[in-house]
Amino acid sequence: MIEWNIKSTTRAQQGLYEYDAVSRLRDSQLGEERVHDVANYIRKGKLWQAFEADKKVVLLIDEVDKADIEFPNDLLQELDKMEFHVYETGETVRAINRPIVIITSN
């Protein structure tokens, strides 16, 4: 099971991935080699982890009511199509095995 515990500051994008532009800028200023591959600065979210799992997993999105009112709507397309686009790399992430998604609310 993959658990995604929602807080009042959680954004839907965090469940997909986060791009660390600040670290990439710092590395470019330091002349780091890793700066040439943008994938080094992508942190996979819980939805991405569930989509790329080798076997069927359960994704628990816990206490969705704590987030902004638009939070559930922001994930509808990704959960319906079981895929999303990573703009920084041009990659489309598709579910290998469709996860079982459980969403809880208080």
PLM feature spans:
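AAA+ P-loop NTPase catalytic core and its hallmark functional loops
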Residues: 1-106
